[in-house]
Amino acid sequence: MAVEYECCGTSFFIHIAVIVLLVLFAGLMSGLTLGLMSMSLVDLEVLAKSGTPRDRIHAAKILPVVKNQHLLLCTLLICNAAAMEALPIFLDALVTAWGAILISVTLILLFGEIIPQSVCSRHGLAIGATVAPFVRVLVWICLPVAWPISKLLDFLLGHGRVALFRRAELKTLVDLHGNEAGKGGELTHDETTIIAGALELSEKMAKDAMTPISDTFVIDINAKLDRDLMNLILDKGHSRVPVYYEQRTNIIGLVLVKNLLTINPDEEIQVKNVTIRRIPRVPETLPLYDILNEFQKGHSHMAVVVRQCDKIHPLQSNDAANETVNEVRVDVDYERSPQETKLKRRRSLQKWKSFPNRANSLGSRSKRWSKDNDADILQLNEHPLPKLDEEEDAVGIITMEDVIEELLQEEIFDETDHHFEDL
């Protein structure tokens, strides 16, 4: 095809200007396709809420544009394709056919693909926020063609998929942001450790943090608080001491060591004559977060970890057996007759984290030290001493400190612990 416009004429310069605009427009569409579509809605929401002041402004401008991702993608690709297809038409009027093909391919590859995508991949947020109003206009112009295609993509591929990190991925992401990873992160070792511990805490259970019964310091309810026992309690350095009845695995309560300050060792008062607080019993499979939530209520910072034995009554149906296994029982009330206790085991019981209703029924005792304080005290004179159920086996003791250590992923030492280490 012959050249239609010779050099230096008015039409020649008009065609040159149109060609330049088409190349720039195609490059902008190509760069925005990579820059805007590579940013997920989650990333933009994070920047809009917690980014730098400039990033917050940019993210707020871009979010409404990229909210409908398929419509935006169709608009950018349609505009890019239109510009690239129109470029050879105007070039063909200035140069020969082979020259038009060579020049158009070079311009599109260099100025329409490589350079724009390189720039927008690095500065896509700022560029996208700058041209966001222009992109909205293009969306309305291309709406008759882009909207049906975007709806078809929504139907086939789904709409509004949010790319969230799984727990393991989030933990790895936190580790990479630590300054020890050498990638420019600003999180310290303690920060990354605590965050990782919080993420792993939901996967850990009571049996992972408990102290075995064999390694636990416990006292008999009938023991005398003489000078030897008081010195032993003092040497152990615990703030709470579990109390058992008849056998070590039958933990019925706990004694606060601070309540023993007024006890005269020479009087040899029995343990059962001092204030014994109730101690809850938790299954060994109870998540640590549920235990932590219950500890925060203030009823007790120590619990007995029990294991369910495989003893099922012959008359019990399979459905009832499955229901008993799948449910979690937390026994914090010992003021029940044996018949009530047996009936309680057959009822549908709740996990600790669903206990607010029960707490309200007991007068909202959580964090209220002056109300219903007697409900946490073991009444020995009015009721028989409790015993461990036959289908349960006490395996350990867990405290608030044990849960916090799992959260921090480090041992917590107090003054007494350091004293024993020095020895």
Curated annotation (Swiss-Prot):
Extracellular topological domain residue ranges: 1-11, 92-94, 158-423
CBS domain boundaries: 210-271, 275-332, 356-415
Example GO BP: magnesium ion homeostasis
Membrane topology: Multi-pass membrane protein
CC per GO annotation: membrane
Keywords: CBS domain, Glycoprotein, Membrane, Repeat, Transmembrane, Transmembrane helix
Membrane side Cytoplasmic: residue ranges: 33-70, 116-136
Matches recorded under Gene3D superfamilies: CBS-domain
Compartment(s) of residence: Membrane
Superkingdom of source: Eukaryota
TM stretches of this protein: 12-32, 71-91, 95-115, 137-157
Statement: the UniProt record of this protein carries the keyword Transmembrane: yes
Residue positions the entry lists as glycosylated: N273, N322
Primary localisation category: membrane
CNNM transmembrane domain span: 8-191
InterPro entries, sorted: ACDP, CBS_dom, CBS_dom_sf, CNNM, Ion_transp-like_CBS
Alphabetized PANTHER family for the sequence: CNNM TRANSMEMBRANE DOMAIN-CONTAINING PROTEIN, METAL TRANSPORTER CNNM
Listed name of the protein: DUF21 domain-containing protein At2g14520
Organism of provenance: Arabidopsis thaliana
Gene designation per UniProt: CBSDUF3
